[in-house]
């Protein structure tokens, strides 16, 4: 099988990128080929230059890149990428230029996390409904997606883990340890 992982560059290297990097690592170790699309997304940049770049990327860069993997059987994409415009160009390019199954691995659902207005939520659910398969964190997320009328097949990961190259130390005492799985910069403590 020809399995591909499509990646979009993320200029903001925060804790959210760690999970995506780990999925990339695990899938490439399992034989997936990477297709890195050279798009830099700065969600806060609303300048004319940024809008022109986004337009060019959506109409030229993405279709050109996707045409390189016409032989794909499965394409995995890690969601979100923080640009609805780019997502709305990427998914149709995959559907038009390949016969691959589109598998979306969800890291965050922005409608839950930040944008709770109906318009954004509907756009996000349309994106997710374009998938042939969604990999969700757990049953709670899956139930929420089903309540929002996401009809794609959903599989629960049921485990959220990071790659750690360190040898497991079984002699540690965890009497006063704190383990925080999140972005410290966004935390209020």
What do these predicted regions represent?
Residues 1-89, 95-101:
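N-terminal pre-catalytic "stem/leader" segment of glycosyltransferase-like enzymes
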Residues 8, 137, 180-183:
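Short hydrophobic "strand-cap" motifs at the C-terminus of beta-strands
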Residues 16, 79, 108, 138-139:
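Helix N-cap/beta->alpha junction signal
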Residues 66-70, 92-101, 117-134:
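Membrane-proximal helix-turn-helix segments that form the acceptor-binding/catalytic region
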Residues 82, 140-142, 185:
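Alpha-helix capping/helix-boundary segments
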Residues 102-118:
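A short, histidine- and acid-enriched strand-loop-helix "catalytic/donor-clamping" loop
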Residues 132-146, 150-167:
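Donor nucleotide-sugar binding/catalytic pocket of nucleotide-sugar-dependent glycosyltransferases
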Residues 170-189:
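Conserved catalytic-core segment of nucleotide-activated headgroup transferases in glycan assembly
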